[in-house]
Curated annotation (Swiss-Prot):
This protein's record includes keyword Metal-binding: no
A cellular component term, taken from the record's GO annotations: small-subunit processome
Gene: RpS7
Keyword Cell inner membrane: no
Gene Ontology biological process: ribosomal small subunit biogenesis; rRNA processing; translation
Keywords: Ribonucleoprotein, Ribosomal protein
Molecular function GO labels: structural constituent of ribosome
Name of the protein this chain belongs to: Small ribosomal subunit protein eS7
Amino acid sequence: MVFGSKVIKSGGAEPDAFEGQIGQAILELEMNSDLKPQLRDLHITRAREIEFNNKKAIVIYVPVPKQKAFQKVQTRLVRELEKKFSGKHVVFIGERRILPKPQRGRRDPNKQKRPRSRTLTAVYDAILEDLVFPAEVVGKRIRVKLDGSQLIKVHLDKNQQTTIEHKVDTFTSVYKKLTGRDVTFEFPEPYL
């Protein structure tokens, strides 16, 4: 497989057909465009398709250490991949792992303390940041309803409204599917 170099799964597993298509598309972009130097060292770990409201979004997972490099070319990459996959929205998310909460009373003497970056809260916040890139999350409000359910209102940078406003429904659906949390996105006027 030629695209095997672009999809490197954890544990050395073989990429499935859909991941193969994504890998092939990224490889073609590397061959044909001026993105070659930036894309040469980059690879993805997995990809999946998420359906919502009769539309589809493609979620591409990238290794966290290579994420900064991906973000340098992400706007171009997303535009090209969306063209190739007939208008499906494409989002890049860092491949992160959540470690379970340590149990009370159980001590494992050779176990390290769980780092903050592996907690559920940190991972979910990072997914949110990755999802809305290139916009920035400038604020967050969590509304707890009387029945105990939570609605997260995320305030995004007003300067990026024109570039990502059409994708807000996609972001909401993808975040709900990945984390199970309801979220709404707003572009508030900046406070002075």
